[in-house]
């Protein structure tokens, strides 16, 4: 199915609408969050409802990138066929499930409702600057059912973005010291993902 992404020019008030195809492998998934990488590329968090809190095992928790530069304005379009026909292609940025599996977290321990993501402060480790991406679950404030709130933190470089054909990252926050000691390193090479560090906290 198609979702609409609405852009608003704060200065002029002009609005535009673009189509986003939330299907993965022919099946539609929930689009839980969207982040701006820059002024034309956006990251969308897509997920199933499986995992911790659902009594099942996580299957799909992924972040995709979509580029709206040159995309068709669908403000005057309606109907799934028309919207999907105008949807720009998307690129897999991070397979969260695969990354967490590589860090030793089983599918059944991955929160079902991974719904939030935000860019954090840049960090400097070994003289190299990394950008950070925070991914979090929504436990619906139901103790003992969905589990504690968890925050998974991934780091990436400008070179990682370039390798995926993505544009420059426009960060809105300042740099910070190296990651805290309890950070959990992820081995993500060859998995079509960008992170290298994950951290989990209780809310």
Regions found by a protein language model. Give the residues of each.
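Sequence/structural signature of beta-propeller domains
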Residues: 1-176
């Amino acid at each position: 199915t198609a979702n609409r992404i609405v852009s608003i020019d704060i200065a002029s008030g002009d609005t535009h609408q673009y189509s986003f195809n939330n299907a993965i492998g022919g099946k539609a998934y929930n689009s839980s969050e969207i982040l701006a990488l820059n002024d034309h590329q956006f990251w969308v968090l897509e997920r199933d409802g499986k995992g911790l809190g659902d009594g099942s095992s996580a299957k799909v928790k992924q972040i995709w990138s979509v580029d709206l530069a040159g995309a068709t304005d669908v403000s005057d379009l309606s109907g799934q066929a028309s919207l999907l026909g105008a949807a720009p292609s998307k690129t897999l940025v991070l397979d969260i499930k695969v990354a967490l599996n590589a860090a030793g977290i089983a599918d059944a321990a991955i929160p079902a409702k991974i719904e939030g993501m935000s860019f954090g402060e840049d960090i400097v480790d070994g003289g190299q600057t990394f950008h950070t991406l925070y991914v979090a679950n929504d436990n619906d404030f139901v103790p003992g059912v969905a589990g504690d709130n968890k925050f998974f933190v991934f780091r990436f470089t400008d070179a990682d973005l370039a390798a995926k054909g993505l544009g420059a990252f426009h960060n809105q926050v300042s740099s910070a010291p190296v990651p805290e000691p309890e950070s959990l390193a992820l081995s993500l090479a060859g998995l079509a993902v960008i992170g290298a560090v994950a951290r989990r906290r209780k809310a």
